[in-house]
Amino acid sequence: MKKKLSLLISLSLVAMLLLTGCGSGNSNKKDENVFRVGLEAGYPPFNWTQMDDSNGGVKIDGSAEYAGGYDVEIAKKIADGLGKELVIVKTEWDGLVPALTSGKIDAIIAGMSPTAERKETIDFSNNYYKSQLVMVVKNGGQYTNAKTLADFNGAKVTGQLNTFHYSVIEQIQGVKKLEAMDNFPAMRVALESGVIDAYVSEKPEAVSAQTANSNFKMIELEDGFVTNPEDTETAVGIKKGSELTAKINEILSGISQEEQTEIMSNAIKNQPAAQ
C-alpha cells in the first residue's frame, strides 16, 4: 500500500513539473513577442495619459487608460522594427531604472537624458530628440519679461526630482531653490497657485505648458544654463549589455530630424488640454 501511495505521489509530482514546464515555456514565448516600455504617462508632450486610443494612443498595461505622446510614437516605431507587440507599462519616474534593471520592462522611452550618472547603471541608445533648457513662469507675472538667469535672482524655482533640471538651478545667483517635485503636472499646479515663481524644463514641455494653459509662459534664456551635450538629448534606456541596443539604434537611424520635428509638433497639438 505504501509503495502504491509513493508511486502515486511521484507520478503526481512529475505531472506537476511537466505542466509547470509547459506553462513557463508558453510564458517565455509570449514575452519574446512583446516590447515592454516604461514611461510616466505624465510628461507632455513626451508622454501623457488619456482615456481612449485617439491620436494613436496605446493602452496602458493593466489599466483602462491609454498613453499618448512623442515617446509613444517613437516606441511604436521601435516595436514595429523589432517585429513585436508594444506594451506600455506606466511607471513613476523614480521607478523606471529599477523596473528596467529588474526585467519588468525592456526599455525606458520617457524623455530621459543619457546622463553620465545614469550610464553607470544602464545603457542608452543614440538620441531620438535634442532640446534645450528653458524656464516656465506665470504669464503676466513678475518674471514674464525675464531674459537671463540673472533676472531670476530671488525667484522661487524648482525642477523635477532626480533630474539634471533640478541640479542646474544652483547656477542662478541668489535663487530660492525649493524642494524638487515628483512630476511636471505637480509643478504646473504649484506655478499657477503661486507656490513657485518658475520651474526648469526642456523646450517641448514648456511649449506644451503654454499651449495647454495661457497662464503659463516659456522663457528662452539669452544667457542660459551651462550643460553637457548629453543632458539635453533624449535617448532610450536599455539594460546593460542588451542586444537590443544595436537593433534600436538601427531603427532610430531611419527616423529623420524632420520626422522627429513633425512627430513632436503633432504631440504638442494633440496633448489633452488638462495636462
Where do the PLM segments sit?
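Extended ligand-binding regions for polar small-molecule ligands
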Residues: 23, 72-81, 163, 229-273
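Bacterial N-terminal signal peptides that target proteins for export
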Residues: 1-9
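Periplasmic-binding protein-like
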Residues: 41, 130-139, 211-252, 270-275
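Extracytoplasmic small-molecule ligand-binding "clamshell" domains
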Residues: 29-112
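A ligand-binding cleft/hinge motif common to bilobed small-molecule-binding domains
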Residues: 95, 111-121, 168-171, 192-193, ...
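Acidic, polar ligand-binding/catalytic clefts
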Residues: 85-151, 226-227
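Bilobed "Venus flytrap"/periplasmic-binding protein-like clamshell domains
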Residues: 44, 64-80, 112, 134-188, ...
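C-terminal motif of bacterial Sec signal peptides marking the signal peptidase cleavage site
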Residues: 17-21
